[in-house]
From Swiss-Prot:
Top-rank EC class of the record's enzyme: transferase
Complex and partners: Homodimer.
Protein's name according to its UniProt entry: Homoserine O-acetyltransferase
Organism (species): Haloarcula marismortui (strain ATCC 43049 / DSM 3752 / JCM 8966 / VKM B-1809) (Halobacterium marismortui)
Gene Ontology MF terms: homoserine O-acetyltransferase activity
Keyword Lipid biosynthesis set for record: no
Residues the entry annotates as binding substrate: R217, D353
Pathway: Amino-acid biosynthesis; L-methionine biosynthesis via de novo pathway; O-acetyl-L-homoserine from L-homoserine: step 1/1
EC numbers: 2.3.1.31
InterPro entries: AB_hydrolase_1, AB_hydrolase_fold, HAT_MetX-like
NCBIfam families associated with the record: homoserO_Ac_trn, PRK00175.1
Function as written in the Swiss-Prot or TrEMBL entry: Transfers an acetyl group from acetyl-CoA to L-homoserine, forming acetyl-L-homoserine.
Lineage of the organism: Archaea, Methanobacteriati, Methanobacteriota, Stenosarchaea group, Halobacteria
Length: 402
């Protein structure tokens, strides 16, 4: 598989908020050969990188394993022998593209929280500018999951004539109030860490706000799993004898078991703090929280009115972060805009992470849609009843009552 890993300067960049920086650099990876009309843009999720494929590469974005290697590659759903696949790290992140930890050329110091606020619109416009640099005027498809799915929707809204097909997976037109609340709590875990220092913690003698970022990531992990998957994987088991608590406890607390689920959360949070920047977590979650498809329009359908391509909306039954009902509402808006749309619902108890861990269920409809649009053999169109009831949230009440 032909793989290109590069960083491109887009020069001065004006953000959605009106602020500018002298230079925006975007790191990207590209796979396959471009033939003029086979380009597929993949939009990564919140803490993802441009390293979407190539399991054996260890020099990309400090991630040993590509985040969607089961989907992108030769003979896979997004077949790099058929398509030229581009994935770009978004502005505000910390995997090569310019963000808070990058050096401000005007001061010689990292931006920190002097970096401009970032929105999903900024991600889309930076991707459009990158594709211009690469000589790609038009896309066969844009594909992405979670907030990457919001990025996909924004492409249909802002550049409807530049893309033939869109695939928002495990996404919605906006976050609901519960998820907004949880993201706010996660950010406060970071900003109340004494090492955060108003976002300026990059000095040689500074320690990053790792405890706050670890807590934020632990909350995120719970959001991405379902009640059933957590029960199946961890239950109430105590951790093994060799497990070590990451966070200190008091003498009375030591009487009680250190559970397997706590050990899992601690381990993954510690690994996350080794590779991700706390300020980037603040910036990217705010971009996700702020996203509203209808912004500037009367409705979601109005926002999508200019898009006349094909759309495959994919959702998962146990995803309480972006529910099947929210996905159906997005599909309805696309139908109202006269787009060709199918809402493909996958029965899964993996929660929000299902789009990353179920390639056998995600791959076939995605591959068929890229090839044949909504008429693809493996593509189904489900009608999801609107309901106020939910059994998706693993901690729906307790987070607010303890």
């Amino acid at each position: 598989m032909n793989v290109e890993h590069n960083t491109v300067s887009l020069g001065e960049f004006e953000f959605d908020c009106g602020e500018t920086i002298p230079e925006l650099e975007i790191t990207y990876e590209a796979y396959g050969e471009f033939d003029g009309d086979n380009a597929v843009l993949v939009c990564h999720a919140l803490t993802g990188s441009a390293h979407v494929a190539g399991r054996d590469r260890v020099d990309s974005a400090d991630q040993a394993r590509a985040w969607w290697d089961d989907i992108v590659g030769p003979g896979k759903a997004i077949d790099t022998t058929e398509y030229y696949v581009v994935c770009a790290n978004v502005p505000g992140s910390c995997y090569g593209s310019t963000g808070p930890k990058s050096e401000n050329p005007e001061t010689g110091e990292p931006y920190g929280t002097d970096f401009p606020p970032v929105t999903v619109t900024d991600w889309t416009e930076a991707q459009r500018a990158l594709l211009d640099e690469l000589g790609i005027p038009h896309l066969h498809a844009v594909v992405g999951g979670s907030v990457g799915g919001m990025n996909v929707i924004e492409w249909a809204k802002r550049h409807p004539d530049h893309v033939d097909r869109i695939v928002p997976i495990a996404a919605a037109a906006r976050l609901d109030t519960q998820c907004l609340s949880l993201d706010a709590i996660a950010r406060r875990a970071i900003t109340t860490d004494p090492n955060w220092k108003q976002g300026h913690y990059y000095g040689e003698d500074d320690e990053p706000p790792s405890d706050g970022l670890a807590l934020a990531r632990q909350l995120g992990h719970v959001m991405y799993l379902s009640k059933a998957s957590m029960e199946r994987r961890f239950g109430r088991r105590a951790a093994g004898r060799d497990a070590v608590r990451t966070f200190p406890t008091d003498a009375a607390g030591a009487f009680f078991p250190y559970r397997d689920v706590e050990s899992y959360l601690d381990y993954n949070a510690e690994k996350f703090t080794e590779r991700f920047d706390a300020n980037s977590y603040l910036y990217l979650t705010r971009a996700m929280d702020n996203y509203d498809l209808a912004a500037g329009f009367e409705s979601d359908a109005d926002a999508l009115a200019a898009f006349d391509g094909d759309a495959l909306v994919m959702s998962f039954t146990a995803d309480w972060h972006f529910t099947t009902q929210q996905a159906e509402a997005l599909a309805d808006s696309l139908r109202a805009a006269d787009a060709n749309v199918a809402h493909h619902v996958i029965d899964s108890d993996h929660g929000h992470d299902a789009f990353l861990v179920e390639p056998d269920n995600v791959g076939p409809p995605l591959a068929d849609f890229l090839d044949a649009g909504v008429d693809g053999n493996a593509v189904t169109d489900s009608v999801v009843e609107d309901s106020q009831e939910s059994n998706f949230a693993p901690v729906h009440n307790s987070l607010f009552s303890q």
